[in-house]
Design a protein with these regions (language model features):
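Beta1/beta-strand and adjacent pyrophosphate-binding region of the FAD-binding site
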Residues: 1
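Structural alpha/beta surface segment adjacent to cysteine/selenocysteine redox centers
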Residues: 6, 10-110
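C-terminal cap of thioredoxin/glutaredoxin-like
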Residues: 4-24, 105-192
Length: 192
């Protein structure tokens, strides 16, 4: 399982390469803000001691991987609840991966604020999701409850940040751990 938050630049960096390393990974969008809150912390983007260094790290990783210059949305971080709900909506239509990539590319390649409903709807439009249907669903209590449940499941599985990958019960947290997760998958495949 590959857990992502759309406003996490490290989730974006991992999402851009996970299909090469873990082609059968099942994507799961979560509400990162709720995961931070459950663990008694907030986004590193709000921590002055970490912010500049981590932003520079993300920019360097993006450049090294040929993803172009990272363009930070303003403001960042922003409220990601609507885009997290939209990821769940997209998942139900078999479009989570393209939607999540479109949304994260809008955020980190174009500098688009995904805290704006219009941006979330545009990400849906780009991947062929009916925008009117998406708009209605984002306000629906059932989708709100489903996001809470998906996030609670991630927390119960041990997820404390995004991106995270779980392979055979082992948690790999961070963009820089994808290779280890892929190696664990290969080891599991050869031991069965």
């Amino acid at each position: 399982m590959f857990f992502i938050g759309a406003m996490s630049p490290y989730s974006w960096l991992a999402a851009e390469r996970i299909s090469q390393l873990l082609p059968h990974a099942i994507w799961q969008g979560v509400f990162a803000g709720a995961i931070f809150k459950a663990n008694g912390r907030s986004s590193w983007g709000l921590d002055e001691q970490q912010r500049d260094a981590r932003m520079a790290d993300c920019e360097a990783r993006a450049a090294a991987r040929g993803l172009g210059p990272l363009r930070w949305p303003q403001p960042w971080p922003t409220n990601d609840v609507a885009v997290a709900r939209a990821m769940l909506f997209a998942e139900r239509r078999g479009a989570l991966e393209p939607f999540a990539l479109a949304a994260m590319r809008m955020a980190f390649c174009e500098g688009t604020d995904l805290g704006e409903l219009s941006a979330v709807l545009e990400a849906g439009r780009r991947v062929g999701i009916d925008v009117d249907e998406l708009r209605r669903a984002l306000a629906d209590q059932e989708l709100k409850d489903a996001l809470r449940a998906a996030t609670a499941e991630a927390l119960a599985a041990g997820v404390f940040g995004v991106p995270s990958v779980i392979v055979e019960g082992q948690l790999f947290w961070g963009d820089d751990r994808l290779e280890e997760a892929a190696a664990a998958t290969r080891r599991g495949a050869t031991s069965t």
